[in-house]
């Protein structure tokens, strides 16, 4: 496990060693976080909230 910091509450987030950029993890604070590659190392950012597309 890799321990990263939550960008919302600054708490520790345990991320699996085999996590890939683009994966979503949920933290205790309720934030949905996206794993991304920050210059060769894993980091977390707030996941973009995508609404439903009704084709309108």
UniProtKB/Swiss-Prot annotation:
Q: Which residues carry this modification: 5-glutamyl glutamate?
A: 56
Classification via InterPro entries:
LysW (IPR005906)
Zinc finger region(s), TFIIB-type: 1-34
Q: Which UniProt keywords apply?
A: Amino-acid biosynthesis, Arginine biosynthesis, Isopeptide bond, Lysine biosynthesis, Metal-binding, Zinc, Zinc-finger
Record Gene3D superfamilies: 2.20.28.160
Place the motif EDWGE on the sequence: 50
Q: Which domain of life is it from?
A: Archaea
Residues with 5-glutamyl 2-aminoadipic acid modification: 56
Entry keyword annotation includes Electron transport: no
One example GO MF annotation: zinc ion binding
What positions are modified (5-glutamyl N2-ornithine)? 56
The GO annotation for biological process reads: L-arginine biosynthetic process; lysine biosynthetic process via aminoadipic acid
Give the residues the record marks as binding Zn(2+). Answer: 6, 9, 27, 29
Q: Does the keyword Zinc apply?
A: yes
Instruction: Spell out the post-translational modification annotation for this entry.
Output: Formation of an isopeptide bond between the gamma-carboxyl group of the C-terminal glutamate and the amino group of alpha-aminoadipate (AAA) is catalyzed by LysX. The bound AAA is then converted to L-lysine in a series of reactions catalyzed by LysZ, LysY and LysJ. Release of the product L-lysine is catalyzed by LysK. Formation of an isopeptide bond between the gamma-carboxyl group of the C-terminal glutamate and the amino group of L-glutamate is catalyzed by ArgX. The bound substrate is then sequentially converted to ornithine which is eventually converted to L-arginine.
Q: Which residues carry this modification: 5-glutamyl N2-lysine?
A: 56
Q: What metabolic or biological pathway is this protein involved in?
A: Amino-acid biosynthesis; L-lysine biosynthesis via AAA pathway; Amino-acid biosynthesis; L-arginine biosynthesis
Describe its assembly: Monomer.
Q: What does this protein do?
A: Carrier protein that bears the covalently bound substrates for arginine and lysine biosynthesis; bound L-glutamate is sequentially converted to L-ornithine, while bound alpha-aminoadipate (AAA) is sequentially converted to L-lysine.
Concerning NCBIfam families, the annotation shows:
carrier_LysW_Arch
What more does the record tell us? Binds zinc ions via its zinc finger domain, as shown by X-ray crystallography. In contrast, the absorption spectrum of the ortholog from Thermophilus suggests that it may bind iron ions, possibly via the predicted zinc finger domain.
Protein name (Swiss-Prot/TrEMBL):
Alpha-aminoadipate/glutamate carrier protein LysW
């Amino acid at each position: 496990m890799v321990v990263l910091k939550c960008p919302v509450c600054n708490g520790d987030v345990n991320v699996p060693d085999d996590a890939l950029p683009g994966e979503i993890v949920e933290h205790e604070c309720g934030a949905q976080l996206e794993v991304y590659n920050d210059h060769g190392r894993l980091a977390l950012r707030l996941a973009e909230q995508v609404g439903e597309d009704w084709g309108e």
